[in-house]
A protein has these predicted regions:
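Flexible mid-to-C-terminal extensions adjoining Fe-S/redox cofactors in radical SAM and related proteins
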Residues: 270-277, 281-347
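Radical SAM enzyme [4Fe-4S]-AdoMet core and its adjacent flexible, acidic
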Residues: 144, 152-262, 266, 300-302
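N-terminal [4Fe-4S]-dependent radical SAM core
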Residues: 1-33, 43, 75, 248-260, ...
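Disulfide-bonded cysteines in secreted/extracellular proteins and peptides
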Residues: 7-9, 40, 44-47, 272-275, ...
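Glycine-centered loop/turn positions within well-structured domains
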Residues: 42, 143-144, 270, 296
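Pocket-edge positions in alpha/beta enzyme catalytic cores
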Residues: 24, 58-61, 86, 111, ...
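Radical SAM/AdoMet-radical enzyme domain recognition
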Residues: 63-83, 90-205
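Canonical Radical SAM [4Fe-4S] cluster-binding loop centered on the CxxxCxxC motif
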Residues: 25-64
Length: 347
């Protein structure tokens, strides 16, 4: 083989390796969910055990390792990255990771899901580093109830201040609320009014069975349909076109009020058919689907001298094996007792 032909062959191999990342059902990965840490300063019952056992620090990927995987995925067509945890802001200097990711040419947005506790100090730094939006988990608008849900005292006002500070520095803010029957389902209209008053998007999430405290049951699930009926009785809604691959169906208020309502119906109406996400856990596991028990350990390659092509092959193999969806699991209740609680997967 001549040198020229060898180069052409190498270029062709490179082109194939970094082609769009497709699974066996034709779904193309465009979004990365990156868990920065499994640690969190809150103890929400649907996410975190009361007495969690943290991953050893030496098992957690460095920012450079996370950045390298993100760069490889960007070459394979991923354009949007969302940082999660645990709580991403408990990890020191996380704005350095934000800057690394936002500097990747192919990446269009770097956003973060956070409990908001550290936003009063961090919002400005995150914005300057290139963060393009935050989603704040806010599971009650009643201070005492909120603090009971998160298992921490005197934190509600600080979270609300964090939302204000993020907006002050120009970070678009969405609010996530997990609705649980008998806990906060009487606040659905209060959250709708929050959206109307502030112009924010409030996203109602169905209660999923990845709870660290094993409290999930079908009876506690409030469906997206029930949430929408409750809101529509007081504030009629108009559905907006759903973006392909979106986890949420978004609605505007029919009377033209500010703000939007969204529902994420992972349990009653999964969006698996056009799911475009791939997940990387803080300890380096590729998780093709939130509900899947299959994990593919990337850390040995990252720390064993593997080149980008080898890592790309590994990722392609893992993503190819993504299963069709959660319908079968939902029908047979195989999702109960998931191997990982939510704080170790990244929401």
């Amino acid at each position: 083989v001549t040198k020229t032909n060898a180069c052409l062959c190498d270029e062709r191999t490179d082109e194939l390796l970094f082609a769009p990342l497709v699974d066996r059902f034709g779904r193309v990965a465009k979004k990365l969910r990156l868990s920065v840490t499994d640690r969190c300063n809150f103890r929400c019952h649907f996410c975190m055990p009361l007495n969690p056992v943290w991953l050893p620090k030496e098992q957690i990927l460095t920012y450079e390792e996370m950045g390298r995987v993100a760069q490889i995925l960007a070459r394979m067509g991923v354009t949007k990255i969302r940082l999660s945890g645990g709580e991403p802001l408990v990890r020191r200097d996380v704005e350095r990771l934000v800057a690394m990711l936002s500097a990747i040419p192919e990446v269009e947005s770097v956003t973060m899901t956070t409990n908001g506790f550290f936003l009063p100090e961090m919002a400005e730094r995150l914005k300057k580093a290139g963060l393009t939006g935050v989603t704040v988990s806010l599971h009650s608008l009643k201070p005492d109830r909120f603090e009971g849900i998160v298992g921490r005292k005197e934190v509600f006002d600080r979270v609300m201040a964090g939302i204000q500070k993020a907006r002050q520095f120009g970070l678009p803010v969405k609010v996530n609320v997990v609705i649980t029957r008998g806990c906060n389902d009487d606040e659905i209209l209060d959250f709708a009014e929050l959206a109307r008053r502030t112009g924010m998007t409030v996203r109602f999430i169905e209660y999923m069975p990845f709870d660290g405290q094993k409290l999930w049951s079908p009876e506690r699930l409030v469906s997206g349909d029930e949430i929408l009926r409750t809101i529509n009785r007081h504030f009629p809604l108009v559905a907006l076109p759903r973006e392909p691959g979106s986890t949420a169906q978004v609605y505007r208020f029919a009377d033209g009020a500010l703000g939007e309502i969204a529902v994420i119906t992972s349990m009653t109406m999964p969006f698996c058919h056009d799911c475009d996400r791939i997940r990387l856990t803080a300890d380096g596991k590729i998780v093709p689907c939130l509900f899947s028990k299959d994990e593919y350990d990337l850390r040995p390659l990252l720390r064993g001298g593997a080149d980008d092509a080898t890592i790309a092959r590994f990722i392609r193999h893992a993503f190819w094996r993504k299963f069709s969806g959660v319908a079968t699991l939902l029908e047979t209740a195989q999702y109960v007792g998931h191997v990982r609680p939510m704080h170790t997967i990244g929401g």
